[in-house]
């Protein structure tokens, strides 16, 4: 049996809690509401994943047709660091559907501690040794300072760049002269910081 992801663990624990409290499992709509999913369909996808991992059984034709099979799932911290792949617009970067896999890397080997890995796409940061295909170790925080290499989301596009702020303007600088800075006007554009880069794992040696 495959271990559960952190998000699957949340769904599993909610199902267990509802059964213990009310004697009945939750509906898809209740799961979506409790865990902040956009729709009951999103909850259904997580239930299907749990069923594939034999943590639950889905009983067709019943809104509360969920039966617990697994009593002691593997804890998510035993999985290692999650590797984030493509990030969908509007979804949290650590949403379960963005997790490609997990890597057995000790988060404490990075300072500050890494929370996830992000697969690097492109050569915009190659001058500081962040290469296409590398796994970037990221500490999840919004407490950032000018000059730090950050993982930023600009209007739902995720990028790795060096941060500079000037009033209402933010400049995201590449470490490659072939790439111009990304300019973000905070009065009209949305910018969110997902974390800071704390290390790199070279894909050719790790994968």
Curated annotation (Swiss-Prot):
A GO MF label: DNA binding
Q: Say which domain of life the source belongs to.
A: Bacteria
Q: Which InterPro entries match?
A: LexA, LexA-like, LexA/Signal_pep-like_sf, LexA_DNA-bd_dom, LexA_repressor, Peptidase_S24_LexA, Peptidase_S24_S26A/B/C, WH-like_DNA-bd_sf
- Residues marked Cleavage (site): 89-90
So what does this thing catalyse? Answer: Hydrolysis of Ala-|-Gly bond in repressor LexA
Keyword Metal-binding in the entry? The reply is no
Keyword S-adenosyl-L-methionine belongs to the record: no
Q: Which UniProt keywords apply?
A: Autocatalytic cleavage, DNA damage, DNA repair, DNA replication, DNA-binding, Hydrolase, Repressor, SOS response, Transcription, Transcription regulation
DNA-binding region coordinates = 28-48
Give the EC number: 3.4.21.88
Q: Active site: which residues?
A: 124 (for autocatalytic cleavage activity), 161 (for autocatalytic cleavage activity)
Supply the Pfam families for this chain.
Answer: LexA_DNA_bind, Peptidase_S24
Q: Name one GO biological process term.
A: SOS response
| Residue intervals passing through the bilayer | none
| Family to which the UniProt record says this protein belongs | Belongs to the peptidase S24 family.
- Oligomer status and interactors: Homodimer.
Give the function comment from the record. Represses a number of genes involved in the response to DNA damage (SOS response), including recA and lexA. In the presence of single-stranded DNA, RecA interacts with LexA causing an autocatalytic cleavage which disrupts the DNA-binding part of LexA, leading to derepression of the SOS regulon and eventually DNA repair.
- What is the name listed in the Swiss-Prot or TrEMBL entry for this protein? LexA repressor
Organism of derivation: Aliivibrio salmonicida (strain LFI1238)
- Gene coding for it: lexA
